[in-house]
């Protein structure tokens, strides 16, 4: 499978469809739609939104960055359709997000995932993210696991 990665607007239709698919998958895994502490990402607070497209133009994955402070950002809405998993597209999206973070002068990326996402946990650990204490809105959440990587 070949793909390209493009920066898109947060309200891009393909991106919205991918985020809806991610929400549906997470709702199923967690048994409800109440699995994300804090405010959901929005066009007002997302600095970078990337979409991975197959050679025929089908949007297969996405990921975003939300600035936390002058030196760090949070990875949000990382998602790859089931058909694209294991193809390397998630790693390519994450590397592209890391490159975008470096270009903005951010030296640290953080993220939140959860215990019902063992595949995501394995992926982030394989990509060099290490577990950290819960931060921000995730403090006290029994559904959150947080990770960080210094770029």
PLM regions: where:
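C-terminal "cap" of GNAT-fold acetyltransferases
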Residues: 3, 7-11, 107-110, 114-151
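Active-site acidic-Proline motif in GNAT/NAT acetyltransferases
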Residues: 81-83, 87, 115
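Conserved GNAT acetyl-CoA-binding A-motif
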Residues: 94, 101-112
């Amino acid at each position: 499978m070949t793909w390209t990665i493009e920066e898109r607007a947060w309200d891009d239709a393909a991106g919205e469809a991918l985020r809806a698919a991610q929400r549906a998958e997470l709702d199923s895994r967690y048994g409800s739609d109440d699995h994300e502490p804090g405010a959901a990402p929005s066009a007002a607070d997302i600095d970078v939104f990337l979409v991975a497209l197959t050679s025929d133009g089908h949007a297969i994955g996405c990921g975003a960055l939300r600035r936390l402070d002058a030196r760090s950002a949070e990875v949000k809405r990382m998602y790859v359709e089931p058909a694209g998993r294991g193809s390397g597209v998630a790693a390519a999206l994450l590397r592209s997000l890391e490159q975008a973070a470096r270009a903005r002068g951010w030296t640290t990326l953080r993220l939140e995932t959860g215990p019902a996402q063992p595949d995501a946990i394995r992926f982030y650990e394989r990509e060099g993210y290490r577990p950290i204490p819960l931060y921000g809105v995730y403090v006290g959440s029994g559904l959150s696991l947080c990770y960080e990587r210094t770029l």
